[in-house]
């Protein structure tokens, strides 16, 4: 019984197969062996058009549309743009044409619906319409300023007298004398013209780290690692006020140019604002996570700028005592800050770079590249010359406008000092900007001046070449 059932099933399958073959012969037998003709003109034209647009679009002025995901603006289709003539009734008759008349404009863009009507259009070809090619977008280089020529600087005088590292300097507003503070716990006042010692002030019990001469009072302010901030009366050469409040060493001190306000900063990670006359602590500017190593004060908001060992720079609202902006571009300790005397700009120095900033929001302007050392001090004069001094004794002079390093010098240690004592800790231009005072680790104070009768022909600066690179900071 089982064998009979299997024979019946096989007969049914054979019958079905035979019927299928007979049907296929009836349908297709008449065309067996004939060659099927296929007109691929449309496909070839589309392929050629797509490759022209992709490879030569930037030269021929091809269509640059709007990229959906990047929100690029739509551009007008140029004289060599491509278009599609579509016939809805007969899609196979559609052709792609190219306008060669340079004066003829096309209002609109290639229709995606028209392309979709063409059979066999590859997905890549759809980029012709509605999507711009990133390679076709011309990116302009940042404008590069040609540096101005500056006369080179040379050593004018070496002043000895301190018994420790010289850590700070300030020039008297009348430009007659300057003062320095050192690791020997003394403050010395020197005649600027002759370099002769005029006075030595003693009172600090640790290294003197900051000095400031008041432009409106006969006062000299000093701070040191002994946590003390002192006010000296230069008529009696004695301390008349102490400002108590810092919990650790005080590393920086600045006076407000128009207000009777004193700002100090130090190892306790805060900057303190003092009333000069009443000795009251007006504000405690807190927010830094580590030692505040540098400080700058100006007349206009933001009136206080601080740089810290936490690698940040903060711009402060002096009236409210709060942070306006925090700049996080530096990756190392910000050891130096310097304001431009005539512009609303400033510079910051660190071991990773020297950076150029613009007030009031702290906009980043660029880098001064080339001083590969730990920069301890920066100074800027009215002639757009910036000086940077480092812990290895290297000195660089920069053109402020272009950021070009036009001169390099190496400080020479004094006889009896080690080569490792070539570090530069502080610097300042005098009020004319023609003399530069540096404080160094070999216990000396050096004064530099520009070379007399220098010309671009006799004393050319370091060569400058414009860069073709797009800089990313």
From Swiss-Prot:
Superkingdom, natural source: Eukaryota
Protein name from the UniProt record: Pre-mRNA-splicing factor prp5
Protein's organism: Schizosaccharomyces pombe (strain 972 / ATCC 24843) (Fission yeast)
Role summary: Required for both cell cycle progression at G2/M and pre-mRNA splicing. Interacts genetically with the PRP4 kinase.
Residues in WD repeats: 161-191, 203-233, 245-275, 287-317, 329-358, 370-399, 419-449
Any Pfam family hit: WD40
Gene for this chain: prp5
GO cellular-component term (any): catalytic step 2 spliceosome
Assembly, per entry: Belongs to the 40S cdc5-associated complex (or cwf complex), a spliceosome sub-complex reminiscent of a late-stage spliceosome composed of the U2, U5 and U6 snRNAs and at least brr2, cdc5, cwf2/prp3, cwf3/syf1, cwf4/syf3, cwf5/ecm2, spp42/cwf6, cwf7/spf27, cwf8, cwf9, cwf10, cwf11, cwf12, prp45/cwf13, cwf14, cwf15, cwf16, cwf17, cwf18, cwf19, cwf20, cwf21, cwf22, cwf23, cwf24, cwf25, cwf26, cyp7/cwf27, cwf28, cwf29/ist3, lea1, msl1, prp5/cwf1, prp10, prp12/sap130, prp17, prp22, sap61, sap62, sap114, sap145, slu7, smb1, smd1, smd3, smf1, smg1 and syf2.
Stored InterPro entries: G-protein_beta_WD-40_rep, Prp46/PLRG1-like, WD40/YVTN_repeat-like_dom_sf, WD40_repeat_CS, WD40_repeat_dom_sf, WD40_rpt
Regions that span the bilayer: none
Matches recorded under PANTHER family: PLEIOTROPIC REGULATOR 1 (PTHR19923:SF0), WD40 REPEAT PROTEINPRL1/PRL2-RELATED (PTHR19923)
Family label: Belongs to the WD repeat PRL1/PRL2 family.
A GO biological-process term: mRNA cis splicing, via spliceosome
UniProt KW Ribonucleoprotein keyword: no
Keywords carried by this UniProt record: mRNA processing, mRNA splicing, Nucleus, Repeat, Spliceosome, WD repeat
Cell location: Nucleus
CDD domains linked to this entry: WD40
